Protein backbone atom coordinates (compact mmCIF):
# COMPACT_ATOMS: atom_id res chain seq x y z
CA UNK A 1 0.00 0.00 0.00
CA UNK A 2 3.01 2.28 0.22
CA UNK A 3 4.59 1.49 -3.15
CA UNK A 4 1.32 0.72 -4.92
CA UNK A 5 -1.49 2.70 -3.27
CA UNK A 6 -4.94 1.89 -4.65
CA UNK A 7 -5.64 5.60 -5.08
CA UNK A 8 -2.50 7.06 -6.61
CA UNK A 9 -4.01 10.53 -6.45
CA UNK A 10 -6.89 12.28 -4.73
CA UNK A 11 -8.40 15.73 -5.02
CA UNK A 12 -9.03 18.29 -2.30
CA UNK A 13 -9.98 21.95 -2.23
CA UNK A 14 -7.88 24.45 -0.26
CA UNK A 15 -9.81 26.04 2.59
CA UNK A 16 -7.64 29.13 2.86
CA UNK A 17 -4.82 30.76 0.92
CA UNK A 18 -1.48 29.10 1.60
CA UNK A 19 2.09 29.52 0.42
CA UNK A 20 3.90 26.25 -0.27
CA UNK A 21 7.54 26.39 -1.25
CA UNK A 22 7.07 29.95 -2.56
CA UNK A 23 3.91 29.16 -4.56
CA UNK A 24 0.61 30.78 -3.60
CA UNK A 25 -2.32 28.36 -3.42
CA UNK A 26 -5.47 30.50 -3.34
CA UNK A 27 -8.45 29.64 -1.16
CA UNK A 28 -10.84 27.36 -3.05
CA UNK A 29 -8.17 26.02 -5.42
CA UNK A 30 -8.35 22.39 -6.50
CA UNK A 31 -5.32 20.55 -5.08
CA UNK A 32 -4.26 17.08 -6.19
CA UNK A 33 -2.52 14.92 -3.58
CA UNK A 34 -0.36 12.14 -4.97
CA UNK A 35 0.29 9.27 -2.53
CA UNK A 36 2.24 7.52 -5.31
CA UNK A 37 4.77 10.38 -5.21
CA UNK A 38 4.74 11.07 -1.46
CA UNK A 39 5.10 7.38 -0.60
CA UNK A 40 8.29 7.26 -2.70
CA UNK A 41 9.77 10.61 -1.67
CA UNK A 42 13.32 10.33 -0.29
CA UNK A 43 12.66 13.12 2.24
CA UNK A 44 10.28 10.72 3.99
CA UNK A 45 11.66 7.29 3.10
CA UNK A 46 15.23 6.02 3.12
CA UNK A 47 15.74 3.92 -0.04
CA UNK A 48 12.12 4.59 -1.05
CA UNK A 49 11.86 1.91 -3.76
CA UNK A 50 13.00 -0.88 -1.43
CA UNK A 51 10.40 -3.10 0.25
CA UNK A 52 11.04 -2.94 3.99
CA UNK A 53 8.13 -3.90 6.27
CA UNK A 54 10.16 -2.78 9.30
CA UNK A 55 9.43 0.81 8.23
CA UNK A 56 6.05 0.33 9.90
CA UNK A 57 7.27 -0.85 13.29
CA UNK A 58 5.79 1.42 15.99
CA UNK A 59 9.16 2.87 17.00
CA UNK A 60 9.92 3.85 13.39
CA UNK A 61 6.46 5.25 12.72
CA UNK A 62 7.05 7.88 15.41
CA UNK A 63 9.96 9.28 13.37
CA UNK A 64 7.86 9.77 10.24
CA UNK A 65 5.71 12.76 9.29
CA UNK A 66 2.05 12.00 9.90
CA UNK A 67 1.19 12.37 6.19
CA UNK A 68 4.24 10.66 4.69
CA UNK A 69 1.97 7.60 4.31
CA UNK A 70 -1.71 8.15 3.57
CA UNK A 71 -3.13 5.37 1.37
CA UNK A 72 -6.63 6.11 2.70
CA UNK A 73 -6.36 9.89 2.60
CA UNK A 74 -6.30 11.82 5.84
CA UNK A 75 -8.16 14.17 8.09
CA UNK A 76 -11.96 14.44 8.05
CA UNK A 77 -12.20 13.02 4.50
CA UNK A 78 -10.14 9.89 5.12
CA UNK A 79 -11.66 6.62 3.94
CA UNK A 80 -14.28 5.49 6.44
CA UNK A 81 -13.34 1.84 5.83
CA UNK A 82 -9.58 2.17 6.41
CA UNK A 83 -9.46 0.30 9.74
CA UNK A 84 -11.65 -2.53 8.42
CA UNK A 85 -9.52 -2.74 5.27
CA UNK A 86 -6.27 -2.99 7.23
CA UNK A 87 -7.70 -5.64 9.56
CA UNK A 88 -9.14 -7.66 6.67
CA UNK A 89 -5.87 -7.42 4.70
CA UNK A 90 -3.77 -8.66 7.61
CA UNK A 91 -6.14 -11.56 8.30
CA UNK A 92 -6.36 -12.62 4.64
CA UNK A 93 -2.61 -12.32 4.06
CA UNK A 94 -1.85 -14.19 7.29
CA UNK A 95 -4.15 -17.05 6.31
CA UNK A 96 -2.59 -17.31 2.83
CA UNK A 97 0.99 -17.17 4.13
CA UNK A 98 0.18 -19.80 6.76
CA UNK A 99 -1.07 -22.26 4.12
CA UNK A 100 1.02 -21.52 1.01
CA UNK A 101 4.49 -20.63 -0.24
CA UNK A 102 4.48 -17.96 -2.95
CA UNK A 103 6.74 -17.69 -5.99
CA UNK A 104 6.45 -14.92 -8.58
CA UNK A 105 6.11 -16.30 -12.11
CA UNK A 106 6.05 -12.94 -13.94
CA UNK A 107 8.62 -10.24 -13.23
CA UNK A 108 7.87 -6.58 -13.75
CA UNK A 109 4.39 -5.16 -13.55
CA UNK A 110 2.79 -2.71 -15.99
CA UNK A 111 0.46 -0.34 -14.21
CA UNK A 112 -2.29 1.90 -15.52
CA UNK A 113 -4.27 4.72 -14.02
CA UNK A 114 -8.04 4.74 -13.72
CA UNK A 115 -10.08 5.77 -10.72
CA UNK A 116 -7.72 3.43 -8.90
CA UNK A 117 -4.30 2.05 -9.77
CA UNK A 118 -4.70 -0.91 -12.15
CA UNK A 119 -2.46 -3.80 -13.18
CA UNK A 120 -2.21 -3.89 -16.99
CA UNK A 121 -0.01 -6.96 -17.38
CA UNK A 122 -0.22 -10.50 -16.03
CA UNK A 123 0.91 -10.89 -12.46
CA UNK A 124 1.00 -14.65 -12.05
CA UNK A 125 2.07 -16.30 -8.81
CA UNK A 126 2.73 -19.98 -8.14
CA UNK A 127 1.30 -21.20 -4.84
CA UNK A 128 2.62 -24.36 -3.23
CA UNK A 129 0.74 -25.81 -0.26
CA UNK A 130 2.81 -25.84 2.93
CA UNK A 131 3.68 -29.21 4.51
Regions found by a protein language model. Name each.
Residues 60-69:
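Active-site-adjacent bridging/hinge elements
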Residues 83-118:
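Cytochrome P450 heme-binding "Cys pocket" and the immediately downstream C-terminal segment
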Residues 121-131:
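C-terminal domain-closing interface element
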Residues 1-21:
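Conserved cytochrome P450 K-helix E-x-x-R motif and the immediately C-terminal K′/meander segment
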Residues 9, 17, 33-61, 105:
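Conserved cytochrome P450 K-helix/beta-meander segment immediately N-terminal to the heme-binding cysteine loop
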Amino acid sequence: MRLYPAASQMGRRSVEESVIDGYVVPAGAQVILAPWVTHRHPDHWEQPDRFDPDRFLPEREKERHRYAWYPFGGGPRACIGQHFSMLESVLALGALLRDFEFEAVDRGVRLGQGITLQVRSPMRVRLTPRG
